[in-house]
Regions:
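N-terminal secretory signal peptides that target proteins for export/translocation
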Residues: 1-11
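Extracellular/periplasmic catalytic domains that process cell-envelope and extracellular macromolecules
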Residues: 67-69, 100, 127-131
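Typically the conserved alpha-helix immediately C-terminal to a functionally engaged Cys/Sec
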Residues: 61, 84-99
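N-terminal "domain-start" segment that seeds a small globular fold
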Residues: 30-62
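Thioredoxin-like thiol-disulfide oxidoreductase module
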Residues: 93, 104-133, 137-141, 154, ...
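Thiol-/selenol-based redox modules, centered on thioredoxin-like
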Residues: 147-172
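Short active-site neighborhood of thiol/selenol oxidoreductases, capturing the structured segment around
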Residues: 66-81
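Bacterial N-terminal signal peptides
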Residues: 15-28
Length: 172
């Protein structure tokens, strides 16, 4: 009888140790994400998380369609795991507040572009230079008015868009 009781206690003890071990191991595997705006770790779409603007992605209109209806387009090439792109997303979101109805905003994650792809000039991939963030402004006639890599200021892009729309210069 004592032998049966001893075996039963050992079995319960082993099951308890196994259950605790699985619990501790699963807690270690599911620790919260450590990504933030100042690092290059992926934690979701930059426009949704850092700009607070999920309406930018996915783009509502293609570049080809925007040019067909003679609407200027602002193309932004980005990746979700770049601190520069995370910080820059707020600038693009602010611009959309002012120009969202007059211009097409086309954010393009470079992960979606084909490597060595041949693109027509009506496809955003045609303008990609290989670095992010990259901002391209194409006017209603398809002419490139701005094509720069890096984080641009709101004012720089605003100045270009004011020229595209023939608006008065911004007052400082």
């Amino acid at each position: 009888m004592s032998r049966i009781l001893s075996n039963c206690l050992k079995s319960v003890w082993r099951s308890l140790v196994l259950a605790v071990s699985i619990f501790v191991f699963s807690c270690l595997l599911t620790y919260p994400a450590l990504a933030g705006i100042d690092d290059d770790k992926y934690d979701g779409n930059v426009f949704v998380l850092y700009a607070g603007n999920g309406s930018l992605v996915p783009a509502r209109i293609s570049l080809a369609d925007s040019l067909k209806v003679k609407k200027p387009a602002l193309i932004v090439f980005y990746v979700d795991d770049s601190s520069d792109c995370k910080k820059y997303s707020t600038v693009i979101s602010q611009l959309q507040a002012y120009y969202g109805k007059a211009a097409s905003f086309i954010p393009v994650t470079v992960d979606s572009l084909e490597l060595n792809g041949k693109y027509p000039n009506t496809d955003p991939g045609y303008y990609y230079k290989g670095a992010v963030p990259q901002t391209v402004i194409v006017d209603k006639d398809g002419k490139v008015r701005l094509d720069e890599i890096g984080q641009l200021s709101f004012e720089k892009i605003d100045d270009t868009l004011r020229q595209v729309f023939d608006l008065l210069p911004r007052k400082e």
